[in-house]
């Protein structure tokens, strides 16, 4: 989501839009404030304090989410940390409820004439999502206690749902590429702690995770961080399902 390629059509769409739906917690800070500035839509403008959206047309999906990894102090020495906390809460399937509720509430506010329709659609969606969450909970039981490393520190919410214990990252620090010294220490740590799983988020190169797998015997699982990031992940439900199945496949005997 940090590396979305901007297109002129995005500005046109924002200029004409009644609302913009976004994850929030400044995860879109690389592109959303600039797009909102150029679009000059009075219903939505950039918030210089939070790097999010400000105005009646702004629909954030994050209100109500239990935010993880809120930093106590801010320093460039920590790498590219998120001041408002880890914004990748969409990787916990249970947060799908909150996301859907926030979208329905936002659309009802922006378009009150059709509020009943949005609430009806929310009820229908949750009726589909809730049984899937229960099913995924049972599937995820096989992942509880599995030790893993991820490429980037965007998986705490995934760990909270699955019970996977993430012990380190391939990156030296958030947004900072690994050094040979860090990788050597990571290999030692993985062997010592019997780390069985390497989680590669789809936006990162496969080379280093593959090398780590060769060195340690751990298996690599690829997960998507947003819809359409992997084949067959066009929706939140499909993304959650694909991620879970990829993890289970990697740790299967």
What are these regions (language model features)?
Residues 1-253:
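Extracytoplasmic metal-acquisition and chelation regions
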């Amino acid at each position: 989501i940090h590396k979305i390629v901007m297109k002129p059509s995005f500005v046109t769409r924002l200029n004409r839009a009644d609302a913009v739906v976004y994850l929030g917690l400044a995860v879109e800070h690389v592109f959303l404030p600039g797009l909102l500035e150029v679009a000059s839509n009075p219903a939505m403008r950039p918030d210089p304090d939070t790097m999010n959206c400000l105005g009646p047309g702004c629909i954030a999906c994050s209100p109500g989410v239990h935010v993880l990894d809120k930093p106590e102090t801010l320093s460039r020495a920590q790498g590219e940390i998120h001041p408002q906390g880890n914004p990748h809460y969409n990787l916990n399937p249970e947060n799908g409820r909150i996301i859907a509720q926030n979208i329905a509430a936002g659309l009802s506010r922006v378009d009150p004439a059709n509020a009943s329709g949005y609430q009806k659609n929310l009820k229908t969606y949750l009726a589909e999502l809730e049984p899937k969450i229960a099913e995924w909970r049972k599937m995820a039981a096989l992942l509880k206690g599995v030790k893993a490393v991820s490429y980037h520190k965007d998986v705490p919410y995934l760990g909270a749902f699955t019970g996977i214990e993430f012990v380190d990252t391939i990156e030296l620090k958030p947004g900072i590429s690994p050094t040979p010294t860090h990788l050597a220490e990571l290999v030692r740590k993985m062997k010592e702690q019997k780390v069985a799983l390497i989680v590669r988020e789809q936006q990162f190169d496969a080379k280093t995770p593959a090398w780590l797998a060769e060195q340690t015997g751990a298996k690599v699982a690829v997960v998507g961080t947003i819809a359409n990031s992997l084949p067959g992940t066009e929706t939140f439900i499909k993304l959650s399902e694909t991620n879970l199945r990829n993890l289970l496949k990697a740790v299967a005997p």
